[in-house]
Amino acid sequence: MKKKNIIIGRIKQDFKPSVFQQIVPNENEIENLVLNKFEEYIPRKFTIEVTEKCTLRCKYCLFSNQLSERHHSEIEMDDLTMKKAVDYYYLIYTNAFKRVSNGYRGEVLSIAPPGISWWGGEPFTNFELIKKSKAYIESLPWHEYGIEKDNFVYSVVSNFTIVNDEILDFLISGKIYLFISLDGGEKEHDKNRVFANNKGSFSRVSHNIDILIKKAPEYCRKYVVIQAVLANNIRGNQGVNSIIKTYGIYTLDSKVLNFQLYPQKVKNQYLPGKRKRINEKKELADFDLLLNQLNSMPVQNLVQFFKIQKGILNEIENLFALDSKIAYENSQSCCIYKKWLTCPAGVDNIFVSVSGDIHICNKSDYSFKLGDVSTGISLNRIKRFYSQYYHVIRNGKCHSCWAVHFCGICPAALLNDGKFHLPNKDECEVVRKNICLQLKKYIMLLNKDELYEKLESAMLNLPKRTFLNYREPLNIRLYEKD
């Protein structure tokens, strides 16, 4: 198989010592290569923090623990700040989108649709601004660029403690993607997700979810995602299994669209809550059994299987994603930001805080703003952001790490109090072991030529790429010519 030989050859090439001579750009390259490509990307996400108010005081929340600059307060985003934020996003989005050729506009709108993601605090404590922002963004002249209201996509992340008929009707009629925080059954959830009086919130949240499912079951199957935090003080498997069983996740009768699991974020920890031991022998044996199971299915059965088994689909997609990380064609085909261990800060994900400051994304601690809605993104601040980040990477242990270009390191996750902190020695070892395991699984897959081709065919027959499953920054240069 020609592709297999190319990829394996590239893996060997990537691990030569000469590859490590420059893993990040120098100061001139930041100016000439990174910043000059800033306008080549179209925003995939626009998030506004509508309020700092929250109905809960979650024990693992950075707000509750008053770390860095994030904290609970009674502050809400005002109408003027909201409109300035939307206007800025409209300008950035349309300036990029107008360069897209007519033949690719449908695909770009599917991957990076215009819209808003509402964030808090608890966003529904400022429901009025949510409604106003939706109405305002839709009032702008998008039609001049061939963009219609049907192209818009909205989402909201909520603890779902606030529910009334108006909110539910807004979600359902607007086809709003709803991400509900639920950490498991009552025992697991109520250990951390509590009200100010320390009373658990599970009974209210689960009751509200039941109301929504009863009111609009089809909406829930298409637009509702349950997301859980794998907190350090709970038994994660019990919580996960409880959610999967309650909502029929990964079955044909699933009551919601999907389930997502995240580790608890802890200051100065890159991999909090993640396993420290990897039983590689068992993992590879189980994966070999899975490959044999997949190989026994015809392509059409694989397509149906992946529609249900989203966890397995995600693992296979991650292995196929190694193609681009290995970059077996040529280095120029790579996204320059991906090659240099980051995303296009300030444009791929435009995050606006309640005060109108623009930050890299909602994963950060708000300690390094990139601009504000009145003046826009400051290229000087972005340059300083990259300079400080790359200085840490260049002068730290990353420089000699064989896994650096496969690492899932993220500047937002490493940012604390305005400074970048690298993972500790043990965390890096876990990362390397995971990457090594992924590469071994990938080579196992490559050695099964027939299955590899069947999986490629199955992927092509799955629903087209959308903002939900497209993981790369969107470079519009790829879509300028038909």
Predicted feature locations:
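Conserved alpha-helical substructure of the radical SAM core
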Residues: P25-S158, I162-E166, G174
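Glycine-enriched alpha-helix->loop->beta-strand junction motifs that scaffold or abut catalytic
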Residues: I172-L178
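Hydrophobic faces of well-ordered beta-strands that scaffold small-molecule active sites
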Residues: F46, I116, Y154-V156, L178-I180, ...
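Cysteine-centered iron-sulfur cluster-binding motifs in ferredoxin-type domains/subunits
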Residues: V50-R57, G346, C398-S400, V404-H405
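Flexible mid-to-C-terminal extensions adjoining Fe-S/redox cofactors in radical SAM and related proteins
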Residues: N5-I11, F15, D357-I358, K363-D482
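Active-site beta-loop-alpha junctions enriched in small/polar residues
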Residues: G121-P123, N159-T161, D183, V229-A231, ...
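Short, acidic, Ser/Thr-enriched surface-loop or helix-capping motifs
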Residues: V352-S353
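Radical SAM enzyme [4Fe-4S]-AdoMet core and its adjacent flexible, acidic
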Residues: S101, K187-S206, D210-T342
